[in-house]
A protein has these predicted regions:
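An exposed, glycine/acidic-rich loop-and-rim segment of catalytic or binding clefts
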Residues: 2-340
Length: 340
């Protein structure tokens, strides 16, 4: 049985719920996890002074200013075009919470913006759970999501998300951490590799067109380590796209690598998921200081969100995003940090 450890009161939600923060530690990593949004609030590597991700020292800054820093959006992360889908012959209309034209991350009151319950807490791991009720944001079924965060002996931070439902529904949760491996004002001094031959081109709403775009010969080709800051046609490339790792969920494998040329800290990403959303953080402009007083402007951090492809329910040939009663959706991702 897991040892019961201390929970720190970190804040209070708008509904008066107490937000707790717990610490897990091991393998050179120290992580602080918040019940609100199952947020990784802080993550540090022994021998490296700066935090590895973006966040805030005060809870009140999260609901006011966070762009999903360290959070777990869902029940269906990323975008659904027009908020529309058909499942088992029934049409559904979801909340249009992005510019009134698209559905994003499960709605305006999604699980990244609500308080989770701590199920277990040990020295090196914490388990949290939340129920997304039937009808919220237009989704069918009561969907239960459990998150297990654990640190291991080789600088590894592992995540297991497990989702169940009592009605057929959509399910796809992800970790939305913004990484910065050197603590500088922007993360453009990083090299990155993504093991994908294709990416998903998008329209003006950032909804996939349905095509699979070959990365070869484009600024999206990260099959070998390359600078994150790239230019195409004389303009800086702006990344907020899904990279296609496979057509279905697989055994866990290495899919991405990021490295700070300034600090020597590297991040390897291993996952079961068929896609990874690479977002370079170019839209960031946070009005208040972040961890350690840092300012978060454009490119302050980057995301590698392991996931089902966005808008998958509306595109034939995209990976499955449907969860049915009796099934358990298990999504696993490891973030492995090393310092030269």
């Amino acid at each position: 049985m897991a040892e019961k450890l201390e929970r720190e009161v970190f804040g209070t939600t708008k509904d008066g719920e107490t937000v707790y923060r717990v610490e897990i530690k091991g393998g050179g990593l120290t992580a602080k996890i918040m019940t609100w949004g199952a947020v990784i609030q802080d993550l540090r590597l022994e021998g490296h002074d700066a935090p590895l991700l973006l966040g805030f020292d005060n809870f009140a800054d999260y609901p006011a200013h966070s762009s999903y820093f360290g959070a777990t959006p869902g029940r269906c992360a990323n975008r659904i075009g027009g908020g529309k889908f058909t499942l088992d012959g029934k049409a559904y209309q979801l909340e249009l919470n992005e510019k009134g034209v698209s559905h994003l991350h499960g709605g305006s009151d999604n699980i990244a913006k609500r308080n989770w319950t701590i199920v277990e807490h040990d020295v090196d791991r914490v388990v949290l759970k939340i129920v997304d009720p039937d009808g919220r944001a237009g989704y069918p079924g009561n969907c239960t999501v459990q998150a297990t965060y654990r640190v291991h002996g080789n600088g590894e931070f592992s995540i297991v998300y497990e989702s169940t439902t009592d009605q057929p529904t959509l399910a796809n949760v992800c970790q939305h951490a913004y990484f910065n491996l050197d603590g500088r004002d922007d993360a453009l001094g990083h090299d990155i590799m993504i093991a994908a031959d294709h990416y998903l081109p998008t329209d003006e709403r950032q909804i996939p067109t349905g095509e699979l775009g070959p990365v070869a010969g484009t600024a999206f080709d990260f099959r070998e380590m390359a600078p994150m800051e790239r230019f195409e046609g004389g303009e800086q490339a702006l990344y907020d796209h899904n990279f296609c790792l496979s057509k279905e969920r697989t055994a866990k494998r290495s899919v991405a690598l990021a490295r700070s040329v300034n600090s020597g800290v590297s991040l390897e990403v291993r996952t079961t998921e068929p896609g990874v959303q690479f977002y370079a953080g170019f839209k960031l402009n946070v009005a208040v200081p972040g961890l350690d007083g840092r300012k978060y402007g454009p490119f302050a951090g980057f995301c590698l969100e392991t996931q089902v492809w966005p808008d998958a329910i509306n595109h034939q040939g995209f990976p499955n995003a449907v969860l049915r009663p009796g099934e358990v959706l298990r999504q696993e991702t490891d973030y492995i940090f090393t310092k030269n």
